[in-house]
Design a protein with these regions (language model features):
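Active-site neighborhood of HAD-like aspartate-dependent phosphohydrolases
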Residues: 1-50
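Short, solvent-exposed loop/turn segments at secondary-structure junctions
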Residues: 11-13, 18-19, 87-92, 127-129, ...
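Short, basic/glycine-rich phosphate-binding loops at helix/coil junctions
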Residues: 41-56, 82-83, 89
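Substrate-recognition element of Asp-dependent hydrolases with the DxDx(T/V) motif
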Residues: 60, 64, 69-102, 109
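A structural signal for isolated positions on well-ordered beta-strands in alpha/beta enzyme cores
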Residues: 81-83, 134, 151
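Structural recognition of alpha->loop->beta junctions
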Residues: 104-121, 166-184
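Conserved Lys-Pro-Asp/Glu-containing loop-to-beta segment of HAD-superfamily phosphomonoesterases
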Residues: 119-147
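Acidic, Mg2+-coordinating phosphoryl-transfer loop and its flanking beta/alpha structural elements
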Residues: 136-174
Length: 185
């Protein structure tokens, strides 16, 4: 059976990162207006205050699954050796934030995707340490160690040119229906 690695944030769920930044700053930034992958950079020189603000908060409390993800994951889980792979350590945050984030991600996955066993979760900072037959991610640098590379469009990768993706052997998709079609469903 082929291995399929699927990123959690921005592929399975719309984490509430922007919502938490807006709560902290008292702003109304929109995710679709952003191009930077590391949204926490918006906080500027208040980054340490932001991480303290986030110490006991989750990015996942009411975070929705991305449209079509539940159905697609149910189908793909029967056909592939499927794993959800996700980072839980945020750059420039203290260790308490990362350990809480690990707990919040674990709880979210168990609640929202009960048909996927916790044995199928991989929590890791460097995703390129893991090889898979197929990978689905929103960041091209996380697709290096897979045979079939699928980039799910997100705010921070929408400006990557098709030529660059083609050179790297990456196929762009916009929806979970397109992923199922690409994987012959």
């Amino acid at each position: 059976m082929k291995t399929l690695m699927i990123d959690m944030d921005n592929c399975i769920t719309d984490a509430l990162f922007m919502k938490r930044i807006n709560e902290f700053l008292g702003t109304d930034y929109k995710l679709e207006d952003q191009t930077e992958f590391r949204l926490q950079k918006i906080t500027g020189d208040r980054i340490n205050e932001f991480w303290q603000f986030m110490k006991d908060k989750s990015f996942y409390d009411d975070a929705p699954l991305i449209k079509g993800a539940y159905k697609a994951l149910e189908i793909l889980n029967k056909k592939y050796d499927l794993y959800i792979i996700t980072a839980f350590i945020y750059p420039n945050s203290n260790p308490d934030i990362s350990s809480n984030n690990l707990k919040f991600k674990y709880e979210y996955l168990k609640k929202k995707l009960p048909f996927i066993s916790p044995k199928q979760y991989i929590f890791i900072e460097n995703k390129n340490l893991i090889h898979s037959d197929i990978a689905i991610d929103d960041k091209i640098t996380h697709l290096n160690n897979s045979e079939k590379k699928i980039l799910l469009t997100a705010w921070h990768n929408k400006n990557i040119r098709d030529e660059e993706l083609n050179e790297k052997g990456i196929v762009r998709v916009n929806t979970w229906d397109e992923i199922l079609e690409l994987l012959d469903y």
